[in-house]
């Protein structure tokens, strides 16, 4: 990784990449799709994480396994799974077609592929953070007249915030680097489905090594920033725990 960054900086290829139309389009598309993905992860992930953290019911272990499954699945298998369910000839292909919706090889397919592989990382972190919130504190808020929504907004969420934020950053980084599921389910159409990882692959296939290295360097820099943010959040949690102790 350090060699890649050093070469990219030494040759000035990173700056050149930022003016390359294909890289610029891919960067813009990646920014758009990962932003939408993060919103979906938050909206759908928090209720599921809360359910897994607070409720013990028959089948909860199975549900946890299903949620975690995309983490261990090869990305290409995830892409095939999405095609089998949401493709034109997939399980939901006909109902979607009846609604006039076609998902494969669209920008929406990119978002779905990113969400499929990234959401479990957020849910795992959020589940751990929410499970660590002391029920007594929440009960005290309820005694004072707080509604369940107010308890979550003003008590639970702030206490679990470091874990939620760390999970969200990790999910965003995973979505940004997603390749296998995207290329199978969404393809690599410039301006529509070609994200940065697909540019790296495409330029390498075209024997344009400098452009491939430059696009890779952009991804590495983004990954390093995400890693530093996660480490900072974990450090903040450790300090808070020591202070509380």
Residue ranges and their predicted role:
Residues 152:
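Active-site/ligand-binding-proximal alpha/beta "capping" segment
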Residues 1-12, 21-131, 155-180, 203, ...:
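Membrane-water interface segments at the C-terminal ends of transmembrane alpha-helices
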Residues 133-137, 243:
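Short glycine/proline-centered loop/turn elements that form peptide/ligand docking sites
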Residues 58, 146-148:
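Short coil/turn motifs that cap or connect alpha-helices
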Residues 84, 181-207:
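Glycine-rich helix-loop "coupling/hinge" segments at transmembrane-helix boundaries
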Residues 141:
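The alpha-helix within a helix-turn-helix
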Residues 144-146, 158:
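Glycine/proline-centered hinge or cleavage motifs at structural transition points of membrane proteins
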